[in-house]
Design a protein with these regions (language model features):
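ER/Golgi luminal nucleotide-sugar-dependent glycosyltransferases, focusing on the catalytic module
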Residues: 1-203
Length: 203
């Protein structure tokens, strides 16, 4: 990690190592866990300031999922689940509350508000898991100065007396979508596969 980590203050190294252990050179688990851990920085990363997790597509709704989770949205808009309407906003409303994304977007700085709104309406995929590696402290600082004041404003709207997985972690889910938007707007990221390590199955 010497060549890549030299771009970071020491305070960020723990986070970088955390992500490296979960970003393998391929998607499928074809061996033991240790064989999937990156032992060095891939050469493909060298010309990029930002590494993001691969995008997840959210436009493949099954009828059973629509009936179970999306019926409230469907009742409000019978055309909501047409293929052309299956975007980030729809996904967020189904799992994290109708109208909550718009409430949050309305609290963004003027320079980001409508661009992020368009991102949620036009995109049906995003870089998931709130995971990124950044070699530019200037870029990272700009991102933090954008996202954290916004999330603090959101706290005044949503509070912390929240219930259910989708709403209890709403700040993380908002940040996940915003991260994908922001780094794709202000940099040219390189994406890398993500896998999940299930301790009940993979030890």
């Amino acid at each position: 990690l010497t060549s890549f980590s030299s771009f970071f203050p020491k305070i960020f190294l723990g986070g970088i190592l955390f992500f490296l252990k979960r970003w393998p050179p391929f998607k499928a688990i074809k061996g033991n866990f240790n064989s999937l851990v990156l032992q060095s920085v891939p050469e493909e990363w060298e010309n990029y300031e930002i590494i993001l997790g691969e995008e997840i597509n959210i436009n493949k709704w099954k009828l059973s999922k629509i009936i179970k989770r999306g019926y409230k949205v469907l009742l409000r808009n019978p055309l909501a689940f047409k293929k052309k309407n299956q975007n980030i906003k729809l996904n967020f409303e189904v799992f994290h509350g109708i109208g909550n994304l718009d409430k949050a977007i309305n609290l963004l700085d003027d320079s980001e508000r409508e661009d992020f709104r368009s991102f949620t309406l036009l995109k049906s995929s995003y870089n998931r898991q709130n995971m990124f590696i950044c070699r530019s402290t200037k870029l990272m600082d700009s991102y933090f100065r954008s996202i954290f004041p916004w999330l603090e404003r959101c706290e005044k709207i949503f509070g912390f007396d929240l219930h259910g997985y989708g709403k209890t972690r709403i700040y993380g889910f908002l940040a996940e979508r915003y991260m994908a938007y922001w780094f794709n707007k202000y940099s040219k990221p390189f994406t890398w596969p993500i896998f999940f390590f299930d301790t009940s199955k993979n030890w």
